[in-house]
Swiss-Prot record:
Gene Ontology molecular functions: phosphoribosylanthranilate isomerase activity
Superkingdom per UniProt: Bacteria
Name of encoding gene: trpF
Protein name: N-(5'-phosphoribosyl)anthranilate isomerase
Keyword Isomerase in annotation: yes
Family of this protein: Belongs to the TrpF family.
Pathway: Amino-acid biosynthesis; L-tryptophan biosynthesis; L-tryptophan from chorismate: step 3/5
């Protein structure tokens, strides 16, 4: 199975349909009202209704389980990505499969990340690693040291986020070998508005890198 692709920050139907046609596996709809990429549940529902293929993901930041479940039901999200500092008991009460984001600090150590994974593993389907930034919860456009997470990606299904683009995705896949990659700001012309030109350039690089990685894994002893 090849590396999967999630694109976050969807606010427009045209962008969602273009990404579906390009081969995205997941589309992320930000449910954090303070974000420039906020897509209210009703708007997300309208877009999801007209897009087939990618799984729609609601992206939440420090919401309670009841709020998350209500938005999931209203919008029709298939997964919930919890991108804040949600406690494990909230994660375990979410009614759909969960992607739990872990924010990687510049001084993080692999054992610290593993401890966080173990704290949440009973209540989640996937993990997502993103670069820590004290001023924002995501869409930083900054990458972290991917080597920190290589062993975690062998043990857990991990989405890799933070600063990925057409120029570095091949190196990211080779270094970490994640389950999926997650992009947002690097595919935009403005916050919440995707650039088809950037999408095309990334897809060319991503598909070539994913195919090369899959071939290498096939020939591994």
């Amino acid at each position: 199975m090849g590396v999967e692709l999630k694109v976050c920050g969807i606010t427009e139907l045209e962008d969602a349909r273009y990404l579906a046609g390009a081969g995205a596996d997941y589309l992320g709809f930000v449910q954090h009202e303070e974000s420039a990429r906020y897509a209210p549940p009703a708007l997300a529902s309208d877009i999801i209704e007209w897009v087939h293929g990618p799984a729609p993901v609601g992206v939440f930041v420090n919401d309670g389980a009841d709020t998350i479940n209500e938005a999931v039901d209203t919008a029709g999200f298939e997964l919930a990505q919890l991108h804040g500092q949600e406690p494990a008991h909230v994660v375990e009460r979410v009614d759909c499969p969960v992607i739990k984001a872990i924010h990687v600090r510049h001084d993080a150590a692999p054992n610290q990340l593993r401890t966080l994974f173990e704290r949440y593993e009973d209540g989640v389907e996937y993990f997502l690693l993103d670069t820590h930034d004290s001023s924002v919860w995501g869409g930083t456009g900054e990458s972290f040291n991917w080597r920190l997470a290589r062993e975690l990606a062998e043990d857990y299904p991990v989405f890799l986020a933070g600063g990925l683009n057409a120029d570095n995705v091949a190196r990211a896949l080779e270094t970490m070998r994640p389950f999926a990659v997650d992009l947002s700001s690097s595919l935009e012309s403005a916050p919440g508005q995707k650039s088809f030109e950037k999408i095309d350039a990334f897809m060319d690089a991503f598909q070539a890198a994913a195919a090369e990685l899959e071939e290498a894994e096939t020939h591994d002893p």
